Amino acid sequence: MLIISYIALCLLFIVYLYTLSVRIEGKIINVMVPYLIITVPTLYVFEGIFVYLSEVQNYTVEYLFFYTCYITYIASFVISYLYTQRKPIYNKSNTKNKPRYVFTSLLFTFLAFIIYLPVLMEFREYILSPRRIYELTRTGYGIYFYPSLMFSLVASICAFFTYKKSKLFCISIVLFNCILIFLHGNKGPIFSIFIAFILYLSYIENKKIKFMFLVKSFAVIAVIVTAFFAYTFTDGNPIENMANYSDYTRNAVLVASSNFDFMYGKLLMESEVYSRIPRAIWPDKPEDFGALYLAKVFFPDAFYRNQGAPAFGYGELYADFGLFTPVWLVISGVFKGVLAKYFSNKTQETKSAHYFIMFLFCIGISVIPVSMGWLFPEHLMIAFMVYIASSFVFSEHIRFVLLRNNK
């Protein structure tokens, strides 16, 4: 089948981009790893299985278009990352005054727990069924749900920087936050913590991680995800359930194959603006903005159930820009690749969590678990908060002392 062959060709090109990244950066765990762990299984493996099991020949052109879009974006991103800025020679004296992250990780852990506590109190009968909490808090609880997840992710990342000082403390903080994240009914951030940690080892500690470690990581994640689907969806084959669950591309194909009128950037604008306004501030905020409008049009039953509407991947961009979608992807890919390289250089130069958070965001690991909008300004604010918090130490006299920055 032509679609399967093209997906396989795209996978070969991704392998080439990864080997290129390894050769230039000298790291097995590099900028491509989040894409390999998160995106490749979803967009290529599971969707490939779905295409193989289903009759989609009538949508061949649409499938080829969107897989071309996928390759266009990742190629633009990786090439701009690798070739737009030289890697500086770092001066060891630049990392002399290291920030302190024990207090920072404790602070953000405390905030994550306190913010989510009202939800746990209200839905305490569902604590052993976190997915039910997730379903019941889709509307009106974002002011508790998302900040709590965000602070848990930030706390875990800050805890990484205490790993060399105290492994027990680091593991305890990360484990507590993973349990708290699990109680949100959202499994995605836990994988983000794992990916962030191996990137920390590679870019902060400069560990020479072997390729087999990456292979074993893939295997462990595959087992966990398969077990999750086997437990959650008791009917049918877990592999088929995963293939049916990874519906980004086929939903985008649904948009492209319909007579949907182009929105000329309206959906993108709504995703960038409306998603930033809490419903507590704007009670009358529309339910059908951005990609949710597509869900309302194409999956009205799921939309009105309000328990998580289907995602559309690049279908949202296609609804706005049509055949000009690849042009947008090239521009955004190059821009984000340049940003990622800048923050990569700063991360390796300063060994600091605030730059590391920005680097993670630029390569696809967001600490704000919101699917809409490009949350770069918000991540800058979070990075600044981490910078301020890490400038304090908890002294032996039980007081906070602002560290002087000797320049």
UniProtKB/Swiss-Prot annotation:
GO terms for molecular function: transferase activity. The lineage of its organism: Bacteria, Pseudomonadati, Pseudomonadota, Gammaproteobacteria, Enterobacterales. One of its GO terms (biological process) is lipopolysaccharide biosynthetic process. This is O-antigen polymerase. One of its GO terms (cellular component) is plasma membrane. The chain crosses the membrane at residues 2-22, 31-51, 63-83, 101-121, 141-161, 168-185, 190-204, 211-231, 319-339, 356-376, 382-402. It comes from Salmonella typhimurium (strain LT2 / SGSC1412 / ATCC 700720). The gene is rfc. Keywords: Cell inner membrane, Cell membrane, Lipopolysaccharide biosynthesis, Membrane, Transferase, Transmembrane, Transmembrane helix. It catalyses: n lipid-linked O-antigen repeat units = a lipid-linked O antigen + (n-1) polyisoprenyl diphosphate. It is an enzyme of class 2 (transferase).
